[in-house]
Swiss-Prot record:
It is found in: Nucleus. InterPro entries: bHLH_dom (IPR011598), HLH_DNA-bd_sf (IPR036638), MYC/MYB_N (IPR025610), TF_AMS/ICE1/BHLH6-like (IPR051358). The gene is BHLH90. This is Transcription factor bHLH90. Keywords: DNA-binding, Nucleus, Transcription, Transcription regulation.
């Protein structure tokens, strides 16, 4: 009820803007039951009701039937008129509910700062000027078909006045309680002072005041309760007393339903939910097996995946432990054999070093019809590269390019070669090169 009364007062305040033809129409919105989701239509003002009344409007007829088609009425209920202007048509297209996000309405409500939008040349927009002004628990929009210069004073005036209109009246904030012998107090002149809701004085009460309590001639106490519980006013014959009922206000605060709770900072609440959703999306991206897309399903799948990783980790640790034990046993056996026969150990170590020293690794890959890639890894020593080139030449291969890389005492040579004849296999070429390299050492 308070919102409807405030909307009527806002329409009365905004109507002169439309009457003066400064703006073509205005729309009033209020925040819905969930302020962070949608806004609801409250009312509007249209300039279509102020066209020349001497113009005769005829109902259009449908061809062939002779039936008259009734024109629809404009949504502005201040002065009932039919849809006959662009402003009326634009109002008929507005929905009763509109989502806040994503859109310009949500930005204005969240930032609580007005926006003055001017459309310079786009044919998609019907209006050239559009103004969105945030007010208390609502939003005001003004539209014009032509371009309007920015008027900061008008915007501030609308914000201040409309916000005041939506605030509750002082008498809605008070609880009046008249204690015994109220009739005697009303018969004699008293002065009333109201704390927290303004001040007023009453002297020589009229017949209206007597009729107000005429229905309770034998009542010892009359209470007038309002929606909001605030300090109560006590009227006594001896003197005026203003007492604040703190206990009642605390009890009423405890009894407030949670459904009427409104967040003080919708922007921070929205950011918090976005962070939670982003974390959920990140968790869902990491877990490979997702059975359900709800929050409970994502968490349960993540727990199962972590348990699987722990089991796999334990298996790998056991396997690594077994490998280490085998290596330790082999080392211990070698040490025991070396202690038993040191001369044999010395001979075997020398032979192993010699084998490793003279080891040559060759890889051959076919890259084309006659093209081959040869990779040779050997010990870096004198005339090693020369022997490799000679072996390639003996195989009747043409060298296209050579890449030479050295690390400590190891050398890797990569050659791109081309054969002079067809039918050369990679395996045969590799064995031939390896044989030539070993015999030349």
């Amino acid at each position: 009820m308070m919102m409807m009364r405030g909307g009527e007062r806002v329409k009365e305040f905004l109507r002169p803007f439309v009457d003066s033809r400064t703006w073509d129409l205005c729309v009033i919105w209020k925040l819905g039951d969930d302020p962070s989701r949608f806004i609801e239509w409250v009312g509007c003002c249209c300039s279509g009701c102020y066209i020349d009344k001497n113009i005769k409007l005829e109902n259009s007829e449908e061809g062939g039937t002779g039936r008259k088609k009734k024109a629809s009425f404009c949504r502005d209920d201040h002065n009932k008129h039919r849809i006959r202007t662009l402003a009326c048509e634009a109002l008929s297209r507005f929905p009763l509910f509109m989502p806040l996000y994503p859109g310009i309405h949500g930005e204005v409500v969240m930032s609580k700062s007005p926006k003055w939008l001017v459309n310079s040349g786009s044919k998609m927009e019907m209006f050239s000027t559009r103004v969105l002004v945030p007010v208390s628990d609502g939003l005001v929009e003004l539209f014009a078909f032509d371009m309007r210069p920015f008027d900061e004073s008008m915007v501030h005036l609308i914000m201040s006045r409309c916000t005041t209109f939506f605030e509750p009246f002082p008498e809605q904030r008070l609880q009046f309680r008249i204690i015994p012998r109220a009739e005697e107090s009303m018969s004699s002149g008293v002065n009333l002072s109201v704390e927290g809701g303004g001040s007023s004085s009453v002297s020589n009460p009229s017949s209206e005041t007597q009729n107000l309590f005429g229905n309770y001639p034998n009542a010892s106490c009359v209470e007038i309760l309002r929606e909001e519980q605030t300090p109560c006013l006590i009227m006594n014959k001896e003197k005026d007393v203003v007492v604040q009922n703190a206990n009642d206000s605390k009890a009423n605060k405890k009894l407030l339903p949670t459904e009427n709770f409104k967040s003080k900072n919708l922007h921070s609440e929205r950011k918090r939910r976005e962070r939670i959703n982003q974390a959920m999306y990140g968790l869902r991206a990491v877990v490979p097996k997702i059975t359900k897309l709800n929050k409970i399903g994502i968490f349960s799948d993540a727990v199962d995946y972590i348990n699987e990783l722990l089991v796999e980790k334990q298996k790998l640790e056991d396997e690594l432990k077994g490998i280490n034990e085998m290596e330790c046993k082999e080392i211990a056996a070698e040490e025991q054999s070396a202690i038993a026969d040191p001369e044999a150990e010395r001979v075997s170590s020398k032979s192993n070093k010699r084998v490793k020293k003279n080891e040559v690794k060759i890889e051959v890959h076919e890259t084309g019809e006659r093209d081959f890639l040869i990779r040779v890894v050997q010990e870096h020593k004198q005339d090693g590269f020369k022997r490799l080139i000679e072996a390639v030449d003996l195989c009747e291969l043409e060298i296209i390019d050579v890449n030479f890389t050295r690390l400590d005492l190891t050398v890797m040579t990569v050659l791109n070669v081309k054969a002079n004849k067809d039918g050369i296999a990679c395996g045969i070429l590799r064995d031939l090169l390896l044989k030539m390299m070993i015999t030349s050492i």
